[in-house]
Amino acid sequence: MGIKLPTLEDLREISKQFNLDLEDEELKSFLQLLKLQLESYERLDSLPDYTPRVKYQRTLGRPPMKEENPYGALVWITSIKGKEEGKLKGKRICIKDNVMIAGIPMLNGSKMLEGFVPHMDATVVSRILDEAGEIVAKTTCEDLCFSGGSHTSYPWPVLNPRNPEYMAGGSSSGSAVAVASGYCDMAVGGDQGGSIRIPSSWVGIYGLKPTHGLVPYTGAFSIEPTLDHLGPMANTVKDVALLLEVIAGRDELDSRQPDSLPPPPVKPYSKLIDGDVKDMKVGIVKEGFNWSNSEKDVDELVLDSAKKLEDYGIKVEDTSIPLHRMGLDIWTPIAIEGATATMILGSGVGWGRKGLFETQIADFFGNSLKSRARDLPNTVKGVLMLGYLMIKMYNNRYYAKARNLSIVLKEAYDSALRKYDALIMPTTPMKAMRYKSEPGFDEYFIMALGMINNTAPFDVTGHPAMNIPVGYSNGLPVGLMIIGRHFEEDKVLKLANVFERIKK
């Protein structure tokens, strides 16, 4: 691409910005030094980049027609097949549109990525194709995934198939609706603040945010590496477990994962869901209920559903984790300042980790930020302004303190999980919010972020957390959330399977 040499004026601006107080003679000396150092950049630029090999051929596909996309769930229809035999043979699978599929346009719900066509397959995509799954669509998601509603997405909003006057939830809105409406058997979603679990709750399906690092994030658009998760969504616990079995496991390209994690399959999750649950203990977390925005019918249905576990020999007790009430406050600086660093200043890829960096995203999104940042959604404009302000004025201390307190928050949950096999609370304090095409400024943000009280803390601590549909109230689904110990998805899925049997 060629590297533009800096000018003296460029260095004057940098000196002024960072209070270096350098005179022009000093700057001229630095200019000569930088030109020498840039020779390494030029040589680096001459080398071919590393991109994972695309293993399977595919046709381009097409945008959906209006009549086949009544709720706005789909953004691109395709048919991509890999091996002929495997665990996912016969399964139709949708992929959230923040995940790269080679040759298929990717919007990430945003005008900012219009025209972007990835050159690589995300690791989860390759693993699905390796096990004979058919990828049938990319699904609509919230604009740059920074919303728990389904009203900010480009090119269209996503409506709730249970009642189209309501939102589907987000940011993995299209994945949830594609599953709920029967378009596919399974879907991959992403979760940094609740984005798998919120739409799963609001449309009434199963959705699992795995332990941080269990499923590789390679080839997906990052918000903040310590919050980034991909996970399975489906109409049955068995299908959630089966998809997790395929996509979980060590990927040498993603440093979010622990080195000790084995390659897939990590565990035979689909075979473990029928395991013995007698003598398991679950704790109902008091602080997950009775928020200022809680709906009484949601709290009551979750409590009643949890008590039914006792019929299966599971001990159910109330427990208290006071710090849970501060979990969202701990998440906020990590999400806002972290997203500012990774998404905005870091052009969608950021710094400070090993593994694969999606340079194609950096080039395209970085250039979009320079030329049309006005097209950013208000959610991300707010993130940019507050994040940059807090970094500049307070020296990154609030991000650092929040990360420190995440250790304390994790230990608070771990302490409870030493007594209990799992914890339970409502996934969201309320049922689906009503969709509005032109909400006021404040209402827009409530629709985007007013439901993440219980979900966001577990993105910070990395615990596995799964939405369980436990019934309806006033025609809308209600979701219960199971939280487990790190890397004990098998126990979470076993409990989920009990709830599924209760429903039947």
Curated annotation (Swiss-Prot):
Keyword Hydrolase assigned: yes
Temperature dependence per UniProt: Active from 60 to 95 degrees Celsius.
Reaction catalysed by this enzyme: a monocarboxylic acid amide + H2O = a monocarboxylate + NH4(+)
Enzyme Commission code: 3.5.1.4
pH dependence: Active from pH 4 to 9.
Subunit structure: Monomer.
Domain of life: Archaea
Keyword DNA repair: no
Sorted UniProt keywords: Hydrolase
PROSITE patterns: AMIDASES (PS00571)
Active site, per annotation: 96, 171, 195
TM region positions: none
Biological function: Enantioselective, active on 2- to 6-carbon aliphatic amides and on many aromatic amides.
Organism field: Saccharolobus solfataricus (strain ATCC 35092 / DSM 1617 / JCM 11322 / P2) (Sulfolobus solfataricus)
Protein name: Amidase
GO molecular function: amidase activity
NCBIfam families assigned to the protein according to its UniProt record, in alphabetical order: PRK07235.1
Family: Belongs to the amidase family.
